[in-house]
Regions:
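Bacterial N-terminal signal peptides that target proteins for export
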Residues: 2-12
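Gram-negative bacterial Sec-dependent N-terminal signal peptides
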Residues: 12-18
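C-terminal segment of classical bacterial N-terminal signal peptides
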Residues: 18-26
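Acidic, metal/ion-coordinating pockets
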Residues: 26-298, 342-354, 364, 414-416, ...
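Catalytic centers of hydrolytic enzymes
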Residues: 28-31, 37, 43, 62, ...
């Protein structure tokens, strides 16, 4: 027997875990090795990179013929290569790497539903999701699971996509022209619909002879909707041996108990290929797992594919935009942790100021989730701008009452100290979050704002030095994802009068601000990583 697990000494490995399974009535000749990734976000050359991942798969195949490579979502969005090719370049690279199973995360839908459905047949591994439903037909949009045979044994992978996709991608992508939802992810406030739908697919896979079943889920743990977390799915289902997870950008391997008290392994690898997960089913039927942080080289053929795809856009992305005299932070320089989703920061101030200058409005609200990378000191290129603002969101200005603004700030602060993509960076106003006050924001089953049921966490809201008037009408600028499409559940602006609609994209607004308002130089006005004090937390 060959044991791949014993052959990994040349790999740098961070953690390891073994989960004993019941002794099986059969024995494999070779290990089954499952390599898994999540939340790559177009990081084709980041960290291990796709070429390193391909080498890991090649090395695994040299030790055992039983190898699968699976992805848990959010692969095709998050950087210029994905934006400019609307996902196709990343799919092409994934095909070259040799994936066997993929699921859509929330950001696979960011180029629109029509575009995602165009990409589905191009993904050679296939896209799978047991809970992605068409409400018009009452059927799954995609296959729910895939059976793979290794020797004479079967392993099933069941896809699961977070219902948070309805609010963390653009909500209108899941609606018809009248604003009625035509797609669902089996969402409700209890989680029962999701558990039932996944259990249905798990049972079907077992009925087809699956010896092991793994959910490959874009679900997450910390900072995600509790009833849709991977841990709660494990606790409310049976017949699952492990959950390969994504969405929350965490790195972990842990064991929880299922509905009947049996162990279920959970694993997630972080983001941008900082690690690759490796799950091994041994000939004795045990599960062993590690997180790998380096590969033994790069696969040359995949490197060529990456270079070919990137060369298409290289001249455009190399165009200079301006210069930053200081690094403009969205991360904490002391820890490296992202703060744009739960704290004031320099880049949040900068983006909000840019929108305010270009859109000429009273107030700007910018969701922290729309800001994806820092701006480094030095010459700035178009690539740098798109790395920070890869969504292509169109800027919008509307009329909103002070009450609507207050509700948006409250919803953005509801998860603090945990991150929230809807956390508001601002211009034209300042506010304080009283973290001693529990959030009383109420949401509907899709995660949309309903009301504030009790005391408010957000206090001392000032507009140009004066207290916010809840009855006054303000011109509010930002991206259409929040203001027009109710992204991150910000439905309080629905029906508001539009003053400017799709005037300019977020990236173009940033470039206009740099070139026409800052004389092509970002000054030390934005040197303080934690911002200029617009957001206070107590």
């Amino acid at each position: 027997m060959k044991n791949f697990w014993k052959k990994t000494s040349l790999l740098l490995v961070t953690t390891a875990m073994t989960l004993s399974a019941p002794l099986l009535a059969w024995a494999l000749e070779h290990d089954i090795v499952i390599l898994h990734t999540n939340d790559i976000h177009c990081g084709v050359n980041d960290n291990i990179g796709f070429a390193g991942l391909a080498q890991l798969k090649k090395d695994a195949l040299a030790q055992t013929p039983n190898v699968a490579l699976v992805d848990a979502g959010d692969a095709i969005q998050g950087a210029p290569l994905g934006k400019l090719s609307t996902g196709e370049a990343v799919v092409n690279i994934m095909n070259a790497v040799g994936y066997d199973f993929c699921i859509p995360g929330n950001h696979e839908f960011d180029y629109g539903m029509a575009r995602f459905l165009e990409l589905v047949p191009q993904q050679q591994a296939g896209y799978y999701s047991a809970n992605f439903m068409d409400l018009r037909t009452k059927k799954q949009v995609l296959p729910g699971y895939k059976l793979m045979e290794f020797e004479d044994k079967k392993v099933a992978f069941v896809g699961a996509t977070t219902p948070e996709a309805l609010t963390t991608s653009t909500p209108t992508f899941f609606q018809d022209a009248q604003g009625k939802y035509i797609y669902s992810f089996c969402e409700d406030t209890s989680g029962k619909k999701l558990y039932k739908q996944l259990q249905k697919n798990i049972n079907a896979a077992r009925k087809q002879g699956a010896d092991f079943v793994f959910i490959v889920g874009h679900l997450g743990m910390d900072g995600t909707t509790p009833q849709w977390s991977s841990e709660n799915i494990a606790k409310h289902t049976t017949g699952v041996d492990g959950i390969i997870d994504g969405h929350s950008h965490e790195r972990y391997e842990r064991v929880v108990q299922n509905k009947k008290g049996k162990d279920v392994l959970l694993a997630q690898t972080g983001t941008k290929l900082k690690t690759v997960g490796q799950l091994v089913i041994t000939p004795a039927g045990k599960l062993e797992t590690k997180l790998i942080t380096a590969a033994n080289g790069k696969d040359a053929e995949v490197q060529k594919v990456i270079a070919r795809e990137m060369d298409i856009y290289a001249p455009l992305l190399a165009q200079p935009v301006g210069e930053a005299l200081v690094q403009v932070h969205s991360n904490d320089p002391k820890t490296g942790e992202r703060i744009v989703r739960n704290h004031g920061c320099a880049l949040g101030d900068f983006v909000a100021d840019a929108y305010k200058a270009v859109l000429d409005c009273d107030i700007v609200l910018v969701n922290g989730g729309s800001i994806r990378n820092e701006l480094q000191a030095g010459v700035l290129t178009y690539n740098d701008i798109l790395e920070a603002f890869p969504f292509g969101n169109m800027c919008t200005v509307l009329e909103a009452s002070g009450q609507q603004v207050l509700d948006a700030l409250e919803m953005g602060a509801m998860s603090y100290p945990e991150e929230s993509g809807g956390f508001m960076q601002v211009a034209g106003l300042s506010y304080t979050i009283d973290s001693s006050v529990p959030s009383s924001v109420m949401l509907d089953e899709k995660g949309n704002f309903v009301k504030v049921a009790g005391a408010r966490r957000v206090v001392d809201v000032m507009v140009d030095g004066k207290p916010l008037d809840v009855n006054k009408i303000y011109s509010v600028g930002g991206n259409g994802y929040i203001l027009k499409s109710a992204g991150d559940g910000m439905i309080m602006f629905k029906g508001a009068k539009l003053l400017q609609d799709a005037k300019i994209s977020d990236a173009d607004a940033i470039m206009e601000y740099i070139q026409n308002h800052l004389n092509a130089k970002i000054s030390d006005k934005y040197a303080n990583a934690y911002g200029d004090g617009r957001i206070t937390i107590k």
